């Protein structure tokens, strides 16, 4: 569960820039959905419980009016109110990042790209991901 959790300071400028890019490129995410690009569609958003905020992925199951609907793709670490697989609705304005993952190819994933840039190259290579735009 927690092996994929990476902690960043809220002051980390590179990660903040990655979140900003993820949010600002949401139109590309919508383009890929409209084109029927194969893969698993996920969005990342802040989830707060017990006074602590984590940034977590949700696998999409649908769209609403300005919202994404889906299932939590990870087990939250800051409490027990939510669990992996819980159905959530997230406002598009709250989305920090997005991914379309098909095998080892990933569109988006700007916060993941930053996390990989911050780790040793050998460790990042073990994930076998090729990022696309």
Which residues are covered by each model-predicted region?
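Mixed-charge, low-complexity intrinsically disordered regions
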Residues: 1-57, 61-133
């Amino acid at each position: 569960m927690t092996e994929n959790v990476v902690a960043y300071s809220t002051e980390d400028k590179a990660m903040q820039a990655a979140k900003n890019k993820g949010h600002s490129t949401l139109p590309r995410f919508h383009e890929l959905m409209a084109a029927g690009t194969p893969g698993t569609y996920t969005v990342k958003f802040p989830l707060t419980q017990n006074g602590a905020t984590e940034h977590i992925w949700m696998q999409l199951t649908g769209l609403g009016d300005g919202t994404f609907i889906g299932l939590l793709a990870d087990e939250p670490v800051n409490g027990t109110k939510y669990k992996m697989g819980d159905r959530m609705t997230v406002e598009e304005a709250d989305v920090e990042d997005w991914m379309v993952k098909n095998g080892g190819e990933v569109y988006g994933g700007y916060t993941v790209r930053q996390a990989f840039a911050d780790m040793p190259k050998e460790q990042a290579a073990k994930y076998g991901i090729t990022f696309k735009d």
